[in-house]
């Protein structure tokens, strides 16, 4: 939860918030399995997606139309990336973990250095709704294209697609949970403790049968918490520890 979101809740009388971490996910850059495996750096992905890129000490509209124009080690394929729309939480993650993070390395962004979030709008990046299955079908039909979506859809479609390594690290449950994979993210739900049924829901959702390694949620793509972290989260739900501004700023729930 962002500080701004927490403040909105407070102003609207929603003050008994319980935050629950449910597991992990990773954003993958996927392609048709007929293509050779690819290694791409976070900076190269940034240069493919950003609306403006640094050249000769200044920002220019993104001129890259092929991956090989960014780096000769990359394939001579058109830059066509299907991804989530601006309304998507996955889009927010891409903006944060790719655009904002890499822009820290370029002084050309000035006041936006480390804050830059503008994705190009020249059809190289193609918003594809909130339907990751649609992106998978696009990759099946277009061998040159890439898709950005959650790890769970890669795990359930490995017969059709593969994912690029990011900075030499493969996307897997192990690398995502360890935060070794650069596009890993933690997943949270937030509950209004004034409604006890929401806590009952969280207790069920984080039960061993659903949320542990080998549980039902892992089978549909969620990277689970470690046994130790799961037990700690289960205890946290029982206590219904409230969220506060200090925890929000620290990115914690208890």
Tell where the protein language model's regions lie, with residue ranges.
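Flexible loop/hinge segments at secondary-structure junctions
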Residues: 1-254
